[in-house]
A protein has these predicted regions:
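Catalytic His-Asp segment of secreted/periplasmic serine-dependent ester chemistry enzymes
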Residues: 17, 153-231
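N-terminal secretory targeting modules
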Residues: 1-56, 62, 66, 70-71, ...
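Charged helix-capping and loop-helix junction motifs
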Residues: 121-131, 161-166
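N-terminal cationic-hydrophobic initiation segments that often serve targeting/anchoring roles
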Residues: 69, 98, 132, 136, ...
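Short amphipathic alpha-helices and their capping/turn segments at secondary-structure boundaries
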Residues: 42-54, 93-99, 133-136
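A short helix->loop->beta-strand "cap" motif at the edges of active sites that frequently abuts
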Residues: 139-143
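Conserved beta-strand scaffold positions in the cores of enzyme catalytic domains, especially
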Residues: 56, 77-79, 181
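Oxyanion-hole/transition-state-stabilizing segment in secreted/luminal serine hydrolases
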Residues: 62-78, 87-125, 145, 149-153
């Protein structure tokens, strides 16, 4: 083997390995969330969260769901939403804010910020698939529920892409074991197909309690199927 081949071979092998690696393994560390994740871990150290419960994870719409325990009485819930995050951020931190809790069910809301930051619907679908693959590596039988990307006034111009992402994720999840797509879109739109302003805060993006009431109503029967009936 000549010298050029010998020196080029490691580069080729590295390139092939990079292609073979799952998407979640090649993402750079999302350092902007270091403080949030450290705060979660400090809280876990002070008081261990319930095992085998229902883990809510995703962006600020999860983070601001401060009434989780009241909305699902008797259900061991954990809130690990961190504001502004995209799907890939949750994927990167699975080993720190998912796996340690051994949840029976994971409820994810994310994808909204992804599209707002320029991701295509196709990329959102791929990122969610990568999240599922990463979770399955540690928790092969956990049930994963995806809450559809919600319509909002602030991001109304992006709604076609969000709707496309919803449809693609729903289609991909359909018929697969331990996966469930929960679509509450219609309840959040008015008769003209516009986002219902009364469900949203002044920023036109985040939800008021009335919006969370819609999510709660949509999720209660789903969680009951998984053995988490509310009291």
């Amino acid at each position: 083997m000549n010298r050029a081949c010998r020196t080029g071979l490691p580069l080729v092998l590295a390139w092939l390995l990079a292609l073979a690696a799952p998407a979640w393994a090649t993402q750079p560390p999302p350092s902007q969330w270091t403080a949030d994740i450290a705060a979660f871990q400090a809280r876990d150290h002070e008081q261990a969260p319930p095992q085998h419960g229902v883990l809510f994870i995703g962006s600020s719409s999860i983070r601001f769901w401060t009434s989780l325990a009241q909305d699902f009485p008797g259900v061991p819930v954990i809130n690990r939403g961190f504001g502004g995050s995209a799907i890939a951020d949750s994927t990167f931190y699975v080993d720190r804010i998912v796996t340690p809790y051994h949840p029976k069910v994971i409820v994810m809301y994310a994808g909204d910020n992804d599209i707002a930051e320029g991701a295509s619907a196709g990329q959102v679908i791929k990122d969610f698939q990568a999240f599922v693959a990463r979770v399955r590596k540690d928790l092969p039988t956990v049930d994963i529920v995806y809450l559809s990307i919600k319509p909002s006034l602030a991001r109304q111009a992006l709604w076609p892409a969000m709707r496309e992402a919803n449809a693609g994720i729903a289609q991909w999840m359909r018929g697969k074991p331990n996966l469930r797509f929960v679509d509450d879109t219609q309840a959040m739109l008015d008769a003209q197909g516009h986002p219902r302003a009364e469900l949203l805060r002044e920023d036109g993006l985040h939800m008021k309690p009335a919006g969370y009431a819609i999510w709660t109503a949509a999720l209660r029967p789903v969680l009951a199927e998984y053995g988490f009936a509310t009291h």
